[in-house]
């Protein structure tokens, strides 16, 4: 079985990885195809191929060359074989059963158990703030934690927690159709919270052998407190249990 998942990050975590992991635990031979630095999400795949390309903006997954769900940029209803009364629009899904694919083939990978470690341990309990600031829907940023709110969060949490701020830079992750932007959050931390809030990029020096996504996984596995924003950010945080406040 060949599983090809080149869509957005959040869709990868909710569709591709659980489908592939289900094949793994059931002894099905499979290979996975994805973008760069996705092996951490498919640690169980012995045959994982990474392509040097951007992620597609759509929600899609191909299994043995055929769409497992309809290629589209909205997730609502996409797991159904028929998406409208016009069957001509969905002839490429005629091979699918009339049910949700995850009824019997959806098992989320145990990221927390697999990546739990004794390396990223700190004097205070971890609190990870996962943010983004990027173009969305052919417009400006929509889903993000603004500077005023970040300031309040940092002020509230830093006395009692090891606060790690995670907003990836373009050099850290594979981008999709969105453009990552700056908005002064790093300056806020550097000018007001130096020594109290740690950028995830600054932790890379502790383990330079890790890729950015590996670093995220090992950190998150030791954390049970998250604040995130809608999208792949919140999906990844939710994999690790504890409390995830989606802003």
Language model region names:
Residues 1-2, 126, 225:
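Structural motif
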Residues 1-84, 215-218, 233-236:
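Active-site and donor-binding regions of nucleotide-sugar-utilizing enzymes
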Residues 5-15, 134-145:
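A short, glycine/small-residue-rich beta-strand->loop->alpha-helix junction that serves as a flexible
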Residues 27, 45-49, 160-161, 223, ...:
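Short, well-ordered alpha-helix to beta-strand connector turns
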Residues 29-34, 128-129, 162-167, 228, ...:
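A structural signal for short, well-ordered beta-strand segments and their strand-loop junctions
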Residues 63-134:
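A nucleotide-sugar donor-handling region in carbohydrate enzymes
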Residues 129-137, 150-213:
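Catalytic donor nucleotide-activated moiety binding site of glycosyltransferases and closely related
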Residues 213-247:
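A donor-sugar binding/catalytic signature common to diverse glycosyltransferases
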């Amino acid at each position: 079985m060949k599983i090809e998942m080149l869509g957005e990050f959040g869709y990868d975590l909710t569709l591709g990885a659980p489908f592939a992991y289900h094949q793994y635990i059931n002894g099905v031979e499979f290979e996975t195809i994805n973008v760069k630095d996705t092996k951490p999400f498919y640690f169980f795949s012995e045959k994982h191929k990474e392509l040097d390309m951007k992620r597609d903006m759509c929600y899609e997954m191909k299994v043995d060359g055929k769409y497992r769900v309809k290629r589209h940029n909205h997730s609502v209803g996409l797991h159904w074989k028929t998406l409208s009364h016009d069957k001509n629009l969905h002839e490429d899904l005629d091979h699918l059963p009339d049910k949700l694919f995850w009824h019997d083939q959806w098992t989320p990978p145990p990221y927390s158990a697999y990546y739990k470690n004794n390396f990223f341990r700190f004097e205070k309990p971890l609190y990870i703030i996962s943010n983004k600031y990027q173009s969305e829907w052919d417009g400006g940023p929509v889903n993000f934690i603004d500077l005023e709110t970040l300031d309040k969060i940092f002020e509230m949490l830093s006395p009692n927690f090891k606060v790690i701020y995670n907003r990836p830079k373009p050099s850290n992750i594979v981008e999709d159709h969105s453009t990552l932007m700056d908005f002064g959050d790093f300056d806020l931390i550097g000018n007001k919270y130096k020594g109290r809030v740690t950028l995830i990029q600054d932790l890379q020096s502790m383990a330079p052998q890790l890729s950015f996504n590996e670093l995220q996984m090992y950190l998150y596995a030791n954390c049970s407190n998250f604040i995130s924003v809608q999208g792949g950010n919140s999906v990844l945080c939710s994999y690790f249990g504890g409390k995830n406040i989606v802003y």
